[in-house]
Regions:
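Intrinsically disordered, low-complexity linker/loop segments enriched in Gly/Pro
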Residues: 1-40
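C-terminal functional regions that serve as terminal interaction/effector modules
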Residues: 26-28, 32-37, 41-194
Length: 194
């Protein structure tokens, strides 16, 4: 369960190409990538996610404790720039700030680069596969379209931005495909979650 160490390590390294933001308050480490955010308790990082911790030490030169930094890969190494915690806090709130959520489940379908998930009301939401995976089967979605995965045992959380086509920006063909998918129920809501 929880984060796969190798997947999280790969995701962190990949994000440094454009800039990875880390926020550590001593208890949890929050990593902000492009359209995803991962929250890992520090004790889990030290005990279980050794590869991820090794990657962070390689990038920073030390184990993060109470830091807010942006890491960008440059020639021959990494450039680490301090960030204001308030600025990063606003971005974190954009993902985690909404308390009202509703259940959502994977459909097993993909469209373009998104894997598709469905709410109980039939709405289909596309979620990018970029970033680390979290091996849990309990998902929820906020009104703002943030898909949240949580592992209650370890306290690890992954947030991804959901995608829904918009009438003002997406083509009629895309909207038609989406509507066609939404008329069918792709999830067995009566089956217990694994």
């Amino acid at each position: 369960m929880a984060f796969d160490d190798a997947a999280l390590e790969r995701a962190l390294r990949a994000e440094t190409k454009h800039g990875l933001t880390l926020y550590c308050n001593g208890e949890t480490l929050t990593a902000l990538g492009y359209e995803w955010m991962a929250v890992v308790p520090m004790d889990g990082l030290r005990e279980r996610l050794r590869g991820t911790l090794g990657a962070l030490v390689e990038m920073l030169g030390y184990i993060p404790e109470n830091d807010t930094v942006r890491i960008v890969r440059n020639k021959g190494g990494y450039l680490v720039q301090p960030e204001l915690p308030e600025t990063v806090g606003e971005e974190i709130c954009g993902y985690a700030g909404e308390t009202h959520t509703e259940e959502i489940r994977p459909t097993g379908l993909r469209m373009w680069m998104n894997f598709l998930m469905q709410k109980r009301n039939g709405d289909i939401v596309g979620v990018t596969t970029r970033g680390p995976g979290l091996d849990v089967r309990r998902y929820s979605i906020t009104p703002g379209g943030i898909v949240r995965q949580e592992d209650g045992d370890t306290g690890e959380r992954l947030y991804r931005r959901g995608y829904r086509p918009r009438e003002d920006t997406d083509s009629e063909a895309t909207l038609r495909k989406w509507r066609h998918l939404e008329v069918m129920s792709w999830c067995d809501w009566d089956a217990p979650e694994e």
